[in-house]
């Protein structure tokens, strides 16, 4: 299901690369999409609290993987949290919070590797991919990423998503205000 969930983001990244890259230079776009992320998190938390019987992992089929994958594709836009969008999609579909989070983080692996390969291709062949600094950077990123995911899984299991929504709203408003100055 991870491969199926990766397809929408892969297609969006390839087909709309230039469009998404143009958004990164716009503070207004970043601020707006942070507000959108906040609403996704807030809305999915509200929906999730109303669903009494959560869906088990066996219900994570092709349809659900594609829907969550489309949420991941939206996160190519700056300000849309990839994990926030995919976890929210899982909660909107009725999955338990921990399952939605675990699937979100599994989906991140091919998405991040694919984005890295595209960036490496764009940077060019002159880059030394096996240099000591590249290996050290990869190792540091892998270790810190693992620790961050463990921490976030624990946090998501024990707390609600409202705090993340409030953070996105506050940051989005500050960025939009800065864009107006």
Curated annotation (Swiss-Prot):
Pfam families associated with the record: BacA
A Gene Ontology molecular function term of the record: undecaprenyl-diphosphatase activity
Source organism superkingdom: Archaea
InterPro entries hit by this protein: UppP
Membrane topology summary: Multi-pass membrane protein
The entry's keywords: Cell membrane, Hydrolase, Membrane, Transmembrane, Transmembrane helix
Residues annotated as transmembrane: 23-43, 105-125, 129-149, 161-181
Keyword Transmembrane: yes
Entry function: Catalyzes the dephosphorylation of undecaprenyl diphosphate (UPP).
Protein's UniProt name: Undecaprenyl-diphosphatase
Gene: uppP
């Amino acid at each position: 299901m991870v491969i199926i969930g990766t397809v929408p983001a892969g297609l969006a990244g390839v087909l709309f690369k230039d469009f998404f890259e143009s958004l990164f230079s716009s503070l207004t776009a970043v601020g707006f999409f942070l507000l959108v992320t906040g609403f996704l998190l807030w809305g999915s938390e509200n929906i999730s609290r109303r669903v009494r019987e959560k869906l088990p992992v066996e219900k994570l089929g092709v349809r659900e993987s594609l829907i969550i994958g489309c949420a991941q594709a939206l996160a190519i836009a700056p300000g849309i949290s990839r994990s926030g969008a995919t976890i929210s999609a899982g909660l909107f579909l009725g999955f338990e919070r921990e399952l939605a989070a675990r699937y979100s983080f599994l989906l991140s692996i091919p998405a991040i590797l694919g984005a890295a390969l595209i960036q490496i291709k764009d940077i060019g062949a002159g880059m030394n991919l096996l240099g000591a600094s590249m290996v050290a950077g990869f190792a540091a990123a892998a270790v810190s990423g693992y620790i961050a995911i463990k921490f976030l899984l624990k946090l998501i299991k024990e707390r609600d998503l409202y705090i993340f929504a409030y953070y996105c709203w506050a940051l989005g408003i500050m960025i939009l205000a800065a864009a107006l100055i």
